[in-house]
Regions:
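Conserved acyl-CoA
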Residues: 138-143, 166-184
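A short beta-loop-alpha structural element at the N-terminal edge
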Residues: 40-58
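N-terminal chloroplast transit peptides
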Residues: 1-28
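Active-site rim helix/loop that mediates acceptor-substrate recognition in acyltransferases
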Residues: 62-105, 109, 114, 118-120
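Short hydrophobic/aromatic beta-strand element in the GNAT-like acyltransferase core
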Residues: 91-95, 112, 146, 151, ...
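Conserved active-site tyrosine of GNAT-family acetyltransferases
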Residues: 200, 205
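Conserved acyl-donor/pantetheine-binding loop and adjacent beta-alpha core of acyl/acetyltransferases
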Residues: 102-151, 214-223
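Conserved beta-strand-loop-alpha-helix junction that forms the acyl-donor binding cleft
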Residues: 150-159, 170-171, 181-197, 211-228
């Protein structure tokens, strides 16, 4: 979820990931948003042309959220198709939509997020460098599984309405229903995206480590539909969902 740059986030050194029960900072609590009752989050599903149409909508919203020069709808769409193809039932794409007058969720797409369940290690572990480092950063065991959240975005015209909160809550709910249940949800966020960091912290996510990441086209596309930047600093954040 993009925002104006206010000030850079201080570099964090590698550390041991905190366990459940860590207190959320007062600043994070002040940034917690009250979710709008008129927003519904649902899984993006379907077949054939119907599914393609829905994926294109999500791709367009994602591209608009990150802005010109950061992503484009075609690259985001390609990333989503790849995730569906290679991750199968371990992948879920969610969209936030506005309820219509009858209470149905058939309004405009306001935001998206996706979650992929991954083994911490082994032949089926992620091959994408950024994601592959998550298990070691969090101190996961060889038998552990984790959920990786990406593609989190809210349409610029619908921010500050609790859409992001509802998307995060839905991601956690779907992750808890995955088999085997992931021990933790992890995500990466740009170090200068203070609005997104505040949102995540307000929902219980904790920073782990910030590191330099090469955002060249192609490498990041495997993790998140081609974010084109230039040496952006990424902060790893996490939330334990299984004791």
């Amino acid at each position: 979820m993009s925002s104006a740059v206010v000030s850079p986030v201080a570099r964090l050194g590698p550390g041991v990931a905190s366990r459940p029960g860590r207190r959320v900072s007062r600043a994070a609590k002040r940034h917690r948003l009250r979710a709008s009752a008129s927003v519904v989050v649902r899984q993006v599903a379907g077949e054939g042309d119907e599914l393609v149409r829905k994926l294109k909508t999500c791709a367009s919203v994602t591209a608009a959220s990150f802005g010109p020069g950061r992503s484009d709808a075609v690259s985001v769409l390609d990333g989503l198709v790849r995730k569906i193809k290679y991750s199968g039932e371990a992948f879920v794409l969610l969209e936030a939509v506005e309820e219509d007058e009858e209470g149905g969720g058939d309004g405009a797409c306001l935001g998206c997020a996706d979650v992929t369940a991954l083994p911490a290690f082994g032949p089926r572990a992620s091959k994408e460098a950024l994601v592959a480092r998550v298990p070691m950063a969090l101190g996961l065991t060889e038998q552990s599984n984790f959920a990786y959240l990406s593609g989190m975005c809210v349409d610029p015209g619908h921010r500050r309405r609790g859409v992001g909160v509802k998307l995060l809550e839905a991601c956690e709910s779907y992750a808890r229903r995955m088999t085997p249940t992931p021990a933790v949800i992890a995500l990466h966020v740009d170090g200068d995206n203070e609005a997104a960091i505040a949102l995540y912290e307000g929902c219980g996510y904790v920073r782990v480590v910030e590191r330099e990441v090469d955002d060249a086209f192609g490498r990041m596309s495997r993790a998140f539909g081609s974010l084109v930047g230039g040496g952006a600093k990424k902060i790893l954040m996490h939330k334990w969902i299984k004791a």
